């Protein structure tokens, strides 16, 4: 029972400094990566062997969803800078925001383009109940003000503060969207 959980946790313990690239690749050929971090570790092993065609696909998939410790974020970003770009950072920031991982999101802000940084900074402040909500939202460019994630975080923030009229306004505005237009409809209540 729970063998996948054990495998997922094992992926976090695999490091190149303790294992050869070949042994890491062999492990993941037998047990395909379950999480984003596993994909990153496999990509790292392929990179050590110069097999860059495999690296790009794995790193782009793994980067978005990986649970990366604070100390490892800069290391992986530097190691894979040829393979990940600002779009990948934006996808990661979006994933972290929707998953409510606001401390990880805060660490990602410096890697985002200016407009996206303003958007995700506002979302992070709303999620973490930090001060400066109005100021952060005012810095979000107009074309991003109706971002579904920002709308969702504003709805939750207003609801927590008992601002039901404001909550209902956002909820109504978004209820007019079709399911295809909504982002993460599973998160809205």
Task: Put a short name on every predicted segment.
Residues 1-189:
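Alpha-helical solenoid repeat scaffolds
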């Amino acid at each position: 029972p729970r063998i996948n959980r054990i495998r997922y946790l094992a992926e976090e313990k695999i490091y190149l400094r303790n294992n050869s690239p070949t042994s890491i690749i062999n492990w993941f050929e037998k047990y395909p990566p379950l999480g984003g971090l596993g994909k990153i570790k496999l990509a790292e092993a392929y990179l050590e062997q110069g097999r860059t065609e495999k690296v790009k696909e794995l790193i782009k998939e793994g980067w978005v969803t990986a649970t990366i410790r604070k100390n490892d974020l800069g290391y992986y970003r530097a190691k894979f800078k040829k393979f990940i770009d600002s779009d990948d950072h934006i996808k990661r920031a979006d994933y972290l925001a929707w998953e409510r991982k606001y401390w990880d999101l805060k660490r990602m802000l410096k890697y985002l383009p200016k407009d996206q940084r303003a958007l995700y900074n506002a979302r992070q402040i709303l999620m973490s109940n930090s001060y400066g909500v109005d100021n952060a939202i005012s810095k979000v460019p107009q074309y991003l003000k109706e971002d579904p994630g920002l709308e969702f975080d504003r709805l939750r923030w207003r609801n927590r503060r008992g601002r039901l009229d404001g909550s209902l306004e956002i909820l109504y505005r978004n209820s007019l969207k079709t399911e295809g237009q909504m982002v993460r409809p599973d998160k809205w209540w």
